């Protein structure tokens, strides 16, 4: 019986051939915590009596949710992670001096490697599957178990094969593809499944698009999202190796067998996609942008950023649309680059000048507004177009506020118009 990529990764880490449904213990290649979830893991670690990390070089803490601290409580919470990192002399501790959103920063640093098993105490840890790794979110106590033992227990997930065909048209990106898939599957249609993205359309998708797609796999209930390594992945890894003096370890590349077993196959013709807008209050409420235009949805705020769409391509797209234009009078716009490197690259390319001159506010890298933390909270009844990943009730502020999830082109064009518009018509 053939195996999927996911089954092969688990087989290698378990030391035996395994298939979906089997329960195995495997060593973890990278454990990821942040300023919100790590203090809970640290408490469990210390209460267990553990004194040392099982594998110090496979543990990272990224300070990204409330950094710089928004209040006394978040400052004290951050202090716990800092003290632990200093005590254990963590190699991979990223604070304000080298900050970024964890799911953008770690790949950028060359710390995510094809063939890895990665866990993180954050649901969007599935992002890293874009590099051919098995990566999933877990609870803080599960993270503590990994810190103490160096491994964890898993049920090998079944895989849904997502076949993407055709070549996407103007202003159609990975964000639109994943929103369309979530519309098809629903928010629990891939529960505890791996979403394996395949098909000829993949070769036309940049790494930033792939990260967006795998990032939102969890919004369909998936355990992970994964894309096989190809020439685009390899070029990205070479670039990361050159920028960081090498990768953390050697890639171990896997491909699904032709006779691998899939629990479901979903085919999406990306050539016929319009930009997809996810209406409140679920990411599965996807509608074509033409419907949103017809609904004449005036907006109060636009937010471009997050671990989903705060990368350099997103800022390039927004700047191209907004050059020489202004944000609508009654609309606010916030731009949050996902890492300091992305921010500096955008400055170097002149993108920040364009966005600021258009009336956008540019913030430091942070999860901030996406989770309703700070730096862009919505008030009662306010409506926001966001390139983020969730639009639940109260996600970005007031319970009566509304979030419409979209790609960066839709967001930028809508900021200019003051209502949701089709960027292809700008």
From Swiss-Prot:
Keywords: 4Fe-4S, Amino-acid biosynthesis, Branched-chain amino acid biosynthesis, Iron, Iron-sulfur, Leucine biosynthesis, Lyase, Metal-binding. Its cofactor is [4Fe-4S] cluster. One of its GO terms (biological process) is L-leucine biosynthetic process. It comes from the Bacteria. One of its GO terms (molecular function) is 4 iron, 4 sulfur cluster binding. Binds 1 [4Fe-4S] cluster per subunit. CDD domains: IPMI. Pathway: Amino-acid biosynthesis; L-leucine biosynthesis; L-leucine from 3-methyl-2-oxobutanoate: step 2/4. Signal peptide: none annotated. [4Fe-4S] cluster binds at residues 307, 367, 370. Its EC number is 4.2.1.33. It catalyses: (2R,3S)-3-isopropylmalate = (2S)-2-isopropylmalate. PROSITE patterns: ACONITASE_1, ACONITASE_2. Catalyzes the isomerization between 2-isopropylmalate and 3-isopropylmalate, via the formation of 2-isopropylmaleate. PANTHER family: 3-ISOPROPYLMALATE DEHYDRATASE LARGE SUBUNIT 2, HOMOACONITASE, MITOCHONDRIAL-RELATED. Heterodimer of LeuC and LeuD. Belongs to the aconitase/IPM isomerase family. LeuC type 2 subfamily. This is 3-isopropylmalate dehydratase large subunit.
């Amino acid at each position: 019986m053939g195996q999927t990529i996911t089954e092969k990764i688990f087989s290698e880490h378990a030391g035996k051939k395994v298939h979906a449904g089997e329960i195995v213990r495997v060593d973890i290649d990278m454990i990821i915590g942040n300023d919100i979830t790590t203090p809970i893991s640290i408490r469990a670690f210390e209460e267990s009596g553990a004194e040392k990390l099982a594998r110090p070089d496979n543990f990272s803490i990224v300070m990204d949710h409330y950094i710089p601290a928004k209040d006394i409580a978040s400052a004290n919470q951050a202090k716990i992670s800092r003290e632990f990192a200093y005590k254990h002399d963590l190699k991979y501790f990223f604070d304000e001096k080298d900050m970024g959103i964890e799911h953008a920063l770690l790949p950028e640093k060359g710390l995510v490697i094809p063939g890895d098993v990665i866990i993180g105490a954050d649901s969007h840890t599935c992002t890293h599957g874009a590099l051919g790794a098995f990566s999933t979110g877990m609870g803080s106590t599960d993270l503590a178990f990994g810190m103490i033992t160096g491994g964890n227990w898993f049920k090998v997930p079944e895989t849904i094969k997502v076949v993407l065909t055709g070549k996407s048209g103007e202003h159609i990106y990975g964000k639109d593809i994943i929103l369309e898939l979530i519309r098809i599957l629903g928010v629990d249609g891939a529960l505890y499944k791996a979403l394996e993205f395949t098909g000829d359309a993949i070769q036309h998708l940049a790494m930033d698009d792939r990260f967006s797609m795998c990032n939102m796999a969890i919004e369909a209930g998936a355990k992970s999202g994964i894309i096989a390594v190809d020439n685009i992945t390899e070029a990205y890894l070479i670039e990361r190796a050159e920028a960081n003096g090498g990768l953390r370890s050697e890639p171990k590349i896997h491909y699904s067998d032709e006779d691998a077993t899939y629990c479901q196959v979903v085919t999406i013709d990306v050539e016929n996609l319009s930009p997809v807008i996810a209406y409140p209050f679920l990411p599965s409420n996807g509608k074509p942008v033409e419907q949103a235009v017809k609904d004449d949805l005036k907006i109060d705020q636009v937010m471009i950023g997050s671990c989903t769409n705060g990368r350099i391509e997103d800022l390039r797209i927004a700047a191209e649309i907004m050059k020489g234009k202004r944000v609508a009078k009654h609309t606010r716009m916030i731009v949050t680059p996902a890492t300091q490197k992305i921010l500096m690259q955008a400055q170097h390319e002149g993108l920040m000048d364009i966005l600021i001159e258009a009336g956008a506010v540019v913030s430091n890298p942070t999860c901030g507004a996406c989770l309703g933390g700070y730096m862009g909270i919505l008030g009662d009844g306010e409506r926001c177009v966001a390139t983020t990943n969730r639009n639940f009730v109260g996600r970005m502020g007031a319970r009566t506020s509304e979030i419409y999830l979209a790609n960066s082109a839709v967001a930028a064009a809508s900021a200019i118009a003051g209502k949701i518009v089709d960027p292809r018509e700008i």
